[in-house]
Design a protein with these regions (language model features):
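N-terminal Rossmann-like or analogous alpha/beta NTP/dinucleotide-binding catalytic cores
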Residues: 1-89, 195, 201
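Alpha-helical recognition segments enriched in aromatics with Gly/Pro capping
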Residues: 84-87, 96-222
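Conserved Walker
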Residues: 93
Length: 222
């Protein structure tokens, strides 16, 4: 069981307090638990999944994204991916029509000034120093504009907190953790298509076998 708890908060879930508004775009593992029962909002949400797995008796190994990145378990893959960012950006455009990564690197540093993730977009990789240059600016997430703080800085991929974009992160994890099989939902089909190519051609590690599943529906049918 892998928790993507370094992903940023994109919106406030129904039923959660409005106090989370100030934390939009921050990694969920750096947001205080609004109910005070876990070390972060991210761990609060992960506990719901883990409780379900425990109740049905599923055996699992639990990994957190924040620990994976802090421990440097993906640093070699990040370096290789960023070295090939131009090639990857062009391939993403070719495979799924997304042009964003022809302009920005597929890596989000956590802004050193405001702790937001998605507002800090990196534009250049300094290969010999293993640092990305970034600027924190206004970014639209869903239908909401999130204000950036304007900070410009550099982030060391071996020390400073940050994460790969989903279009390349799966490939890095598959390679680092020797993943041979991974199922995925049809909503992330484009990401899997790109990650398969990144694993095979950039990281030179065969992508895992896949099974695609349909969407899970909640009680409201969403």
């Amino acid at each position: 069981a892998y928790s993507d708890d370094l992903d940023g908060l994109r919106k406030i879930p129904v039923g959660f307090p409005d106090s989370l508004e100030e934390h939009l775009a921050k990694p969920v593992s750096l947001i205080p638990d609004p109910y005070g029962c876990h070390d972060s909002y991210g761990m609060h949400m992960s506990s719901i999944l883990l409780d379900g797995l425990d109740k049905v008796g599923i055996k699992y190994e639990f990994r957190r994204a924040i620990d994976t990145y802090k421990q440097g378990l993906l640093k070699d893959q990040i370096h290789t991916i960023l070295q090939n960012n131009t090639k990857i950006g062009d391939k993403i455009s070719e495979l799924v029509g997304q042009e964003k990564y022809q302009k920005y690197l597929p890596y989000f540093p956590v802004c050193a000034n405001c702790n937001r993730l998605y507002t800090a977009e990196s534009t250049e990789y300094i290969i010999d120093e293993k640092k990305v240059k970034y600027r924190c600016h206004d970014t639209e997430i869903g239908s909401k504009m999130i204000k950036g703080c304007g900070h410009e800085g550099e982030a060391d991929i071996t020390k400073d907190l940050g994460k790969l974009a989903w279009k390349v992160e799966f490939a890095a994890r598959w390679t680092a953790f020797d993943i041979r099989f991974e199922a995925y939902g049809k909503d992330i089909m484009d990401s899997v298509k790109v990650n398969d190519w990144v694993a095979d051609e950039i990281l030179e590690c065969p992508h895992p076998h896949h099974v695609k599943y349909e969407m899970f529906l909640d009680k409201g049918g969403k």
